[in-house]
Amino acid sequence: MKQAIPLETRVITALANHERLLQQVGQMKKQIGAHLAECPVMKKANDWSISAQDSKDIYDEKTGLVKTHLWGAFNELVEGSHGGMVRMNLDDQENYLTDPWCDETRCDHCYAAWRVIQDRRDVRQELGQARRTLRMLGKLALRVMP
């Protein structure tokens, strides 16, 4: 017969898992920043000696974000299956960043950042599950408290 795990043990385990995932997301955020800092476009954007025209080409007018290769992968529009213009799917984004025949869009640093972003998406889903587990344990604790 399976023995029930004490509530206190379940709560501590859930809290530790939640904290581990939060720290992992924070580390991934730093990794993304480090990879993007190595992108040639980002390095050019941080150069104070660039011309006004180059500066205009490097920054997005609407958001003010640097138009890194990763920015291009997330914002480039392609023709959708129904004829309209849509953003690229994950496969198209990966091809955009790794195309060996296109030096304009290929960037190993932006691709590394993109990979971490995809992994972070999975960790955030785990974090959501960890939050739901904590909530469930909290409700259970309220029921057993006098």
Give the residues covered by each predicted segment.
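Contiguous, amphipathic alpha-helical segments that mediate oligomerization or scaffolding
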Residues: 2-49, 106-140
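Extended alpha-helical coiled-coil "stalk/arm" regions
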Residues: 28-92
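Amphipathic protein-protein interaction modules
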Residues: 76-121
